[in-house]
Amino acid sequence: MAREKIVVAGGSTKSWKLLLGLRVFAFMATLAAAIVMSLNKETKTLVVATIGTLPIKATLTAKFQDTPAFVFFVIANVMVSFHNLLMIVLQIFSRKLEYKGVRLLSIAILDMLNATLVSAAANAAVFVAELGKNGNKHAKWNKVCDRFATYCDHGAGALIAAFAGVILMLLVSSVSISRLLINSKHLSTTATTTAVV
């Protein structure tokens, strides 16, 4: 008995499993980045001035909401996580459905848009993290990470997860585009075969 190759949802079962696995990992990476950054907060009491020998202390809090780039980072990672979760659910529950060109095209476009979105958010957050770590002597912005080390470490962890999400979303986009190309070749050969018959 010869084994038949099962074609599922615009590609082979191998590409279906690969895409599902990549989406699951991209979902976990972007969700982890969003959660770590959204819970990133550190409060410290610091000496802000000295009058004579009397130190004046203030309690300062570093949190992600203070920086618009970090807020964008959290929102973008949540949006990409939601997109991946939705695509995972659709991929699992509509496995038997035949994907036509428009549906595959819209999925590929959404994947590319989400890869761009998470990349932009991660790069904006890296820019602000660099300012927090090293400051800017020309603008007279002091560094923050020497005082809020835990805050900066958590932010670095979120950035690592986000860049893993960027790489995974680029791979998801590549697989989505290849499935679209395979489907269009399959449709064109089917149309040619029917036209000849």
Curated annotation (Swiss-Prot):
Regions that span the bilayer: 18-38, 70-90, 107-127, 157-177
Location in or out of the cell: Cell membrane
Top-rank taxon, per record: Eukaryota
Extracellular side: 39-69, 128-156
The entry's keywords: Acetylation, Cell membrane, Membrane, Transmembrane, Transmembrane helix
Cytoplasmic side: 2-17, 91-106, 178-197
Annotated positions of the N-acetylalanine modification: A2
GO CC list: plasma membrane
Alphabetized Pfam families for the sequence: CASP_dom
PANTHER family, A to Z: CASP-LIKE PROTEIN 1U1 (PTHR36488:SF8)
Assembly: Homodimer and heterodimers.
Family: Belongs to the Casparian strip membrane proteins (CASP) family.
Identification of the protein by name: CASP-like protein 1B2
Taxonomic lineage: Eukaryota, Viridiplantae, Streptophyta, Embryophyta, Tracheophyta
